[in-house]
């Protein structure tokens, strides 16, 4: 029993930061957090665009993709045929056409001085969708996770 406690403590220390990286601010719905992280109708330089996201989480996010489209258009993808997500769930949907997007990758810095590379892309995307929460827009399904870029 004594040997188990240090091992448990080590696991908690190692897994704690991983869990924090995937959490979203609890005062936001998952759809609203998706919109903040991934919807940017007009292209912005990544250092500027990422500062808003990093201010919520208080750390430098390693990678992020901004879709240059409206939330309404991205939410419409949720009405397309369901496909299997990376996590094996069946709530993902692929865009029917490519969209302009910006890929931001952390190159240096420590919060709040995060520095990113900026790469313009024109690709398809896959989003995970869930039923809306009370304060979400009134769609049948809303995007909650950017699962992949194709």
From Swiss-Prot:
Signal peptide (from-to): 1-23
Keyword terms of this UniProt record: Antibiotic, Antimicrobial, Disulfide bond, Endonuclease, Glycoprotein, Hydrolase, Lysosome, Nuclease, Secreted, Signal
Enzyme active site: 38 (proton acceptor), 145 (proton donor)
Gene Ontology CC: extracellular space; lysosome
GO molecular function, one term: endonuclease activity
Known function: Ribonuclease which shows a preference for the pyrimidines uridine and cytosine. Has potent antibacterial activity against a range of Gram-positive and Gram-negative bacteria, including P.aeruginosa, A.baumanii, M.luteus, S.aureus, E.faecalis, E.faecium, S.saprophyticus and E.coli. Causes loss of bacterial membrane integrity, and also promotes agglutination of Gram-negative bacteria. Probably contributes to urinary tract sterility. Bactericidal activity is independent of RNase activity.
Alphabetized PANTHER family for the sequence: RIBONUCLEASE, RIBONUCLEASE K6
Protein known as: Ribonuclease K6
């Amino acid at each position: 029993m004594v040997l188990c406690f240090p091992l448990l403590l080590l696991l908690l220390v190692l897994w704690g930061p991983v869990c924090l990286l995937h959490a979203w601010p609890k005062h936001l719905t998952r759809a609203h957090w998706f919109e903040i992280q991934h919807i940017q109708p007009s292209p912005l330089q990544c250092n500027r665009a990422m500062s808003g996201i990093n201010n919520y989480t208080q750390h430098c996010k390693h990678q992020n993709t901004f879709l240059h489209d409206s939330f309404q258009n991205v939410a419409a993808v949720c009405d397309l045929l369901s496909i299997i997500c990376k996590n094996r769930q069946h709530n993902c949907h692929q865009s029917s056409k490519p969209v302009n997007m910006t890929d931001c990758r952390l190159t240096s810095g420590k919060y709040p001085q995060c520095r990113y590379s900026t790469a313009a892309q024109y690709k398809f995307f896959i989003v995970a969708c869930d039923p809306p929460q009370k304060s979400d827009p009134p769609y049948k399904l809303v995007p909650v996770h950017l699962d992949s870029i194709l």
